[in-house]
Amino acid sequence: MSLYATQDEKKQAAAKAALKHLPKGGILGVGTGSTVNFLIELLPELQLEAAVASSEATAKRLKELGIEVVDMNHVGGLDAYVDGADEIDRHMHMIKGGGAALTREKIVASIAKKFVCIVDDSKWVEQLGRDFPLPVEVIPMARSAVARKLVSLGGDPVYREGVVTDNGNVILDVYNLNILNALELEKTINDIPGVVTNGIFALNAASIAIVATNNGIEERTAV
């Protein structure tokens, strides 16, 4: 029997458990997505100086709670970045980008000393990409050319119709990639002309995962 009646209750529990891993005061990097939205509601407890947001949607939520949002260009670094994931494995490698904010998420994560990932256990996987497609942000004029390159890598790219990123680009969701070496594939796809970035977070892996399971909260690190 689960401690939680719904998946949303799991997400709320993971968000609450993450607070102790986040510094009070200072400037926090904040991700995007349904689990992070639960965390944002709790952030006033940390009495933050400000936050760096990974999307316009997150910035709006933070401002509604009275938390100042600052431009990353005015920040030298962050003590922590907190975000969810579409998938995460035992190496703390992730697939992100279901909400199309992957590029800004990766940028903000890159200047943080610590990446705290908050998920429910449905996001914990043995191998990335088997159940969730890999999002790739692409400059619009390069969409077809990039898609052909992704096919040559063994993927089946699908254009995410009607979605334009905060950066004015489009998303290709790539199915059926065999992601055995996440670090290598992240670099390979990023080297394709026209790709802004892809949703593999291996170079910017999580430092710790706060995982809500049926039996409660588990804190996991890379093995």
Curated annotation (Swiss-Prot):
HAMAP family from the UniProt entry: Rib_5P_isom_A
Gene Ontology cellular component list: cytosol
A biological-process GO annotation: D-ribose metabolic process
Protein family: Belongs to the ribose 5-phosphate isomerase family.
Pathway as given in its UniProt record: Carbohydrate degradation; pentose phosphate pathway; D-ribose 5-phosphate from D-ribulose 5-phosphate (non-oxidative stage): step 1/1
Record text on subunit structure and interactions: Homodimer.
Function (record text): Catalyzes the reversible conversion of ribose-5-phosphate to ribulose 5-phosphate.
Catalytic EC class: isomerase
Taxonomy of the source species: Bacteria, Pseudomonadati, Pseudomonadota, Gammaproteobacteria, Moraxellales
Binding site residues for substrate: T32, G33, S34, T35, D83, G84, A85, D86, K96, G97, G98, G99, K123
Name of the protein: Ribose-5-phosphate isomerase A
InterPro entries (UniProt xref): NagB/RpiA_transferase-like, Ribose5P_isomerase_typA_subgr, Ribose5P_isomerase_type_A
